[in-house]
């Protein structure tokens, strides 16, 4: 959004050399904000200020082929698939990235409030974009939406995924790659 938060995000990305493929700041809504609450046992819960949020107003015509062509990595997540016209713009970005031979990554990143509790709708949108994706980041809970952890190798074959990283909170993470499963232990954080 064209507000203090949106300008801060834009400047921070620029300072770190991250090129945005959507250059305009949205006039129709404010920047979507996420508020994270930690429970005593370390579980996170999310609340979003997004009624509507600027991210929901990204349009297909905002996605320019030249920007995709000049990119190295195209990354998106399911939050941008939860509302039109951003969903169509996201699909276009991922499709163009694939067609142009870019590394395409995708974070399933299911958030109940953004999908109004409809995991099936999220799973349907995610499987729609998987043919364009090389690398998927998914949590163990999100894997359940897509057939479960045991289905990850089959999902990789079906959609031509190069790697899937499954995060398991305090239990670490697994990386599925080249018919192998690699494990990394969790690192204790101070969040």
Segments (PLM) and residue ranges:
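Glycine-rich beta-alpha junction loops
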Residues: 1, 52, 110-112, 169-171, ...
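Conserved N-terminal subdomain of the carbohydrate kinase-like
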Residues: 1-78
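Short, hinge-like loop/turn segments at secondary-structure boundaries
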Residues: 12-15, 39-42, 121-125, 153-156, ...
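A short, aliphatic-rich alpha-helical micro-motif
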Residues: 67-69, 129-130, 158
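Conserved phosphate-binding/catalytic region of the ribokinase-like
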Residues: 95-99, 149-191
């Amino acid at each position: 959004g064209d507000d203090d938060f949106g300008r801060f995000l834009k400047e921070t990305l620029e300072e770190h050399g991250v090129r945005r493929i959507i250059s305009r700041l949205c006039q129709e809504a404010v920047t979507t904000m996420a508020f994270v609450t930690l429970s005593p046992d370390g579980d996170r819960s999310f609340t979003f200020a997004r009624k509507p949020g600027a991210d929901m107003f990204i349009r297909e015509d905002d996605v320019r082929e030249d920007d995709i062509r000049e990119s190295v990595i195209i990354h998106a997540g399911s939050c941008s698939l939860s509302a039109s016209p951003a969903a169509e713009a996201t699909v276009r970005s991922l499709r163009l990235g694939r067609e142009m031979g870019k590394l395409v990554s995708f974070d399933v990143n299911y958030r109940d409030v953004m999908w109004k509790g409809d995991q099936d709708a999220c799973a349907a949108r995610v499987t729609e974009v998987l043919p364009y994706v090389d690398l998927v980041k998914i949590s163990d809970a999100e894997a359940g939406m897509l057939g479960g952890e045991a289905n990850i190798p089959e999902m990789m074959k079906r959609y031509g995924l190069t790697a899937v990283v499954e995060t398991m909170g305090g239990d670490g993470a697994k990386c599925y790659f080249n018919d192998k499963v690699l494990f990394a232990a969790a690192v204790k954080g101070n969040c």
